[in-house]
Amino acid sequence: MELLFTLMTLIAFSVLGLLLAFLCFIMMIMFMGKSIGDPEYPPVKGTVFHQLFYFTKLHDYHTQMAKTHPTFRLIAPDQSEVYTIDSRNIEHMLRTNFDKYSKGKYNQNIVSDLFGLGIFNVDGDKWRQQRKLGSYEFSTRVLRDFSCSVFRKSAAKLVRLISEFSHEDLVFDMQDLLMRSSLDSIFKVGFGANLNCLEGSSKEGSEFMKAFDESNALIYWRYVDPFWKLKRFLNIGGEAALKRHVKLLDDFVHGVIKTRKAQLELQQDSNVKEDILSRFLMESKKDQTTMTDQYLRDIILNFMIAGKDSSANTLSWFFYMLCKNPLVEEKIAQEVKDFTSSHESEPNIDEFVANLTDATLDKMHYLHAALTETLRLYPAVPTDGRTAEADDVLPDGYKVRKGDGVYYLAYAMGRMSSIWGEDAVEFRPERWLNNGIFQPESPFKFIAFHAGPRMCLGKDFAYRQMKIIAMTLVRFFRFKLANGTQNVNYRVMFTLHMDKGLPLHAIPRS
């Protein structure tokens, strides 16, 4: 017995010794050749292990460091990660020296299982091809009219569903409803498919949404997990779950592509293809070598995260802000009544949404300001960046080396008094208005839609969707937090998702 105890103790200490040796090796790799303490390079404020420790509040961790060091570094085993809130650096990277910064192998390796060769994960010819096609599609009147029609129907469905909760005085998860509604809309606009996820009648749709959100979070975890490649090789932990989720996504999307191809074969006499996938499929006939089903799958999933998550997440934070700022909610409600001529106590929902024309949406300056203010504080993509393709010097004087990741902190920027004034952390739509007219800021200061040549193609598309949903829901309901004044936290993933949803009560305005 004593011998067994001695052997077990020896084994335990041996394992501990190997672990310590491995950690020492990792730390040596992390700090060698990284110019620690060199004033020409951004100051080192931590390592990837610090991000691991603060992961659940990662964006606030970055914000605290950026308050004292607008540009700083975190050290990882295979590269330095430079973080900045300096708009000069951001413009330098995203526009002035666009060709010197790419997505980079490091980022591409991390996200390729989910995003493949989609527009958010490629450079060069593939990026230009998708950008050109996407730019054309988003500029067509056909897509504009079709998408607005879909958004109006989605808004009406939301009102009817929330009315049921309201009449029974039930608490509901607003984020979940917005995610389901947005998924339905994006599938209809993007792929010509009726998913019926909001009504809950589509098990496949619900499973797809869950798999997509979980994949989003698990992929982002790779940025702070130095052992993710080992876990993927062994097919354990989160990597095993990610593999299952991605397979479900692949099977579902390839099924959508197959179905749409078959439908198009029966519609050959029609030249007007309203949904985006149909027009990409028509394009694929000209270039069957490049535009494979797998390539279309990648394009679809990139479109999904841009369309579903960005709008639904922003609207979730928007309604959270309205609950925290009821005077803002009432100002928006009054603006909606004034510009839709719907002062009657109980307007007809179908007639109301039918009147939400482009001309009406364009008049909603206060609503536009409130949505933009939401994006300032809760950007859909809280952190984004590029990889330096050559040694460079940033406008603030700091050097970066070839291979360094350079990230801009949109979430932190929205909270900086040096950028937005002493009231930076306050939700104040008025900061965007001049005599009641919306005034935009530089995209390198307000970075929610990216900037430069890769600026978001769907910006106007997103604002139209958000305005139609927001106008409709605010016209028919007042909203209150189900848990009183309790704060809502985010879940760390590519997009700024609420952790545990947004439980609300809805009170009919009539």
Where do the PLM segments sit?
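Cytochrome P450
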Residues: 2-21, 75-82, 142-153, 163-188, ...
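N-terminal membrane-proximal hinge/A-helix region immediately C-terminal to the signal-anchor transmembrane segment
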Residues: 2-129, 150-161, 245-248, 390
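Conserved cytochrome P450 K-helix E-x-x-R motif and the immediately C-terminal K′/meander segment
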Residues: 48-70, 251, 255, 351-398
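Cytochrome P450 heme-thiolate "Cys pocket" and heme-binding signature region
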Residues: 136, 432-466, 491-492
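Conserved cytochrome P450 catalytic core segment spanning the I/J/K helices
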Residues: 139-141, 244-315, 342-357, 364, ...
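Central I-helix of cytochrome P450 enzymes
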Residues: 182, 186, 246-253, 283-340, ...
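Cytochrome P450 heme-binding "Cys pocket" and the immediately downstream C-terminal segment
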Residues: 326-328, 406, 459-497
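Conserved cytochrome P450 K-helix/beta-meander segment immediately N-terminal to the heme-binding cysteine loop
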Residues: 408-437
